[in-house]
Amino acid sequence: MRISVNWLQSLVELNLSPEELGELLTIAGLEVEEIEDRRSWAAGVVLGRVISREKHPNADKLSVCVVDIGTEEPSTIVCGAANVRADILVPVATLGSYLPKVDLKIKPAKLRGVKSSGMICSLAELGLSKESEGIHIFPDLDLPSGSPVGPLLGLDDVILEISPTANRADALSMVGVAREVAALTGGKLSLPEIKAVSVSDQDLPISVTEPQACPTYVGTVIRGVKVGPSPDWLQQRLLAAGTRPINNVVDVTNYVLLEWGQPLHSFDQDKLQTLVGPEGFALGVRFAEEGEKLITLDDQERTLQPQNLLVTANDQPVAIAGVMGGAATEVDENTQNIVLETALFDGVTIRKSSKAINLRSESSTRYERGVNRCELEVALHRAIALMTELAGGTVVRQGKADQRQDRGEAIINLRLERLQQLLGKVNTPTGIGNITAEDVERILTDLGCGLTRQSDSDTPVWAVTVPSYRQRDIEREIDLIEEVARLYGYDHFCEQLPSNTIAGGLSPSYQAELALREACRGVGLTEVVHYSLVKPHGSEVMLANPLFAEYSALRTNLLDGLITAFANNQAQNNGALNAFEVGRVFWQNEGDIGEADHLAGICGGSQITEGTWPQGGKPQPMSWYDAKGLLEAIFQRLGATVTYSGDHQDPRLHPGRTALLSCNGTVLGRFGQLHPQLRREKGLIDEVYAFEITLTPLYQAMETQILGTPDFRPYSPYPAVARDLALYAPLELTVAELTQAMVKAGGDLLEQVELFDEYRGQSVPAGQRSLAFSLAYRVGDRTLTDADVEPLHNQIREALTKQFAVSLRS
């Protein structure tokens, strides 16, 4: 925001140079990015009166002017402007002066044979405009020739370009900065005196259908205004702030926005009436419908989105609320009656609306950060007073829809002991000490806070009442402590390190993620990273304002990206891509947006990566069990016990070669071979396997094994007793179900169950397969005998025959 020092001095007592003020504000947190000293722009430029103007004898487009600049003898100046004439007041750059905005030193010159002693200036040459059609002509002034023109053009000013942090919405106004300067320097505030305007006729119809998005809307009708240029003082203040003057009505709304931080907007009432027809109009606030259009004040036709909040007249859009008005109701030189809008719009709503159509304005910037809801009426009365003073007119009607929730007073308890503990020692005039209670009371009082002591001890506690204009960023005790430190001055604190330090560490979730990535890399997978933005296909979460159509939606899974990457690598003859990705996915959930962290992986090709020599020159494709073993190795490294069951829900995976992964009764995800149809569409090799799992339940299973205290168990020094078990099982019966039944029946003596053979073919009953398991029995205190093992082994055999339709072969 651009801060005029002259304007600031009218609001607060200020005895600092611009450089000192800039340093003070920067140290206090309102960073001053640039100091623009305009006083040098018109140094040596004075007010001159053109006594006579004659045509140049040797040039058709030049004039020879005699100009009174307050010296004993008038100056002869050759001028090329078409609008120069006798008896006008103009700015004259005298001999020896320097115009920094055009890098021109004024010297005696001879133009086409005529001597010229100075230059009559345009606003462009003085740095006040980019282009100019001629010299600047002052209105009749009661000033002698030779007077400096700097004060007349606002060039006796210094501009500070400040960049407030996002939490300091109050600093986006001149009054807010004046309050800050008063708190920092102790200067006296001189805010403009504002008288309340009473309106007896309160029958202007206002309908707000979205009270959360628009808690307050006030419309005020002012009739009989006379639109014209604003006075010089108002135009100069607007120009200093970087705002182009338009006319007195519009300039007043912009001026109040800059002064109080409250956006306003003026509608031409007669144009509103023409737009809606002969019947009376009612103002309203609602969200846009898909496909609605509105031409805004910048003459751009906007296609509106459902996120856009609109101001309507009889339900017809007339403005994008809080962002920009509509061209159809613009105030111009023919306007006689206006409707003045003053409103509170929700910051989040305005931010979404602004982004949806890629349009930002001074109003939207302030609404996004939050305006002071308690000073809305102050800004309204200020605008009405200025408008009736500068444009005439009479306030005749008003309407208000006010559903503001009463926040009440924000009271926060502040402990001096806590403040001193956090801030530490400071350098005082008498040496090193603590911030005193008197310092705290002085600083917070200067900030506009009210203080009530709760105790009179050496370390008192105060009940601090926060002013309304700071309630958005001062919400807790720590915020008050920060304000005390900021205004006391960071340069007064002692330079010492904290005495008590705490060892840092990684959060459990981050430890789990690191362990997961290490486990995946440990089994030979390469980590890849894809964009989280994808091309939409129908069910994705769409972006409101995407940069490109190809990246206009949030991904719903990771596997699609891995499949595409696998196909690209294969097409480039880079071989099979054995890779994994950890990332976040998004989905629609009953109007809300859900999100979760996922792990996905893909593998295929030959299972031997060292070459084809061991297979006699023939590659050996990866089998389903090879890929499953790779996934199990990851889970084993993570200490998670995962069970497998049949599944055919994912259309990308082979329905007969897909497993549902579960851990502690919670579904993790799926693993399987890619569907043949998908492989043909992508041109992939036959043996490609993939998995995708949700990480939250996996992390929970990892907490004890990986993130908690390790559980060490010694190896048994005694040998295991091995037994084989072969059976015929139906094809739909999974190995996981058989394994679970054996583990449950075997109890503590059964150490391991491993499938070592599967056969389908001749001598196997139709619809079945032959499975062979190796069972290992072991304990840690002795060697098991046949008498220990045989009863338990028979118990397992009986459990299988009772629970499943299997036929034992051994």
From Swiss-Prot:
Residues 407-495 form the B5 domain. It catalyses: tRNA(Phe) + L-phenylalanine + ATP = L-phenylalanyl-tRNA(Phe) + AMP + diphosphate + H(+). InterPro entries: aa-tRNA-synth_II/BPL/LPL (IPR045864), B3/B4_tRNA-bd (IPR005146), DNA-bd_dom_put_sf (IPR009061), Fdx_antiC-bd (IPR005121), Fdx_antiC-bd_sf (IPR036690), NA-bd_OB-fold (IPR012340), Phe-tRNA-ligase_IIc_bsu (IPR045060), Phe-tRNA-ligase_IIc_bsu_bact (IPR004532). Gene3D superfamilies: 3.30.56.10, Bira Bifunctional Protein, Domain 2, Ferrodoxin-fold anticodon-binding domain, Nucleic acid-binding proteins, Phenylalanyl-trna Synthetase, Chain B, domain 3. Mg(2+) binds at residues 473, 479, 482-483. Its cofactor is Mg(2+). Its EC number is 6.1.1.20. Keywords: Aminoacyl-tRNA synthetase, ATP-binding, Cytoplasm, Ligase, Magnesium, Metal-binding, Nucleotide-binding, Protein biosynthesis, RNA-binding, tRNA-binding. Binds 2 magnesium ions per tetramer. One of its GO terms (biological process) is phenylalanyl-tRNA aminoacylation. GO terms for molecular function: ATP binding; magnesium ion binding; phenylalanine-tRNA ligase activity; tRNA binding. Residues 716-809 form the FDX-ACB domain. Pfam families: B3_4 (PF03483), B5 (PF03484), FDX-ACB (PF03147), tRNA_bind (PF01588), tRNA_synthFbeta (PF17759). It is found in: Cytoplasm. GO terms for cellular component: phenylalanine-tRNA ligase complex. It is an enzyme of class 6 (ligase). The keyword Nucleotide-binding applies. Residues 39-150 form the tRNA-binding domain. The keyword Hydrolase does not apply. Belongs to the phenylalanyl-tRNA synthetase beta subunit family. Type 1 subfamily. Tetramer of two alpha and two beta subunits. NCBIfam families: pheT_bact, YtpR. This is Phenylalanine--tRNA ligase beta subunit. It comes from Synechocystis sp. (strain ATCC 27184 / PCC 6803 / Kazusa).
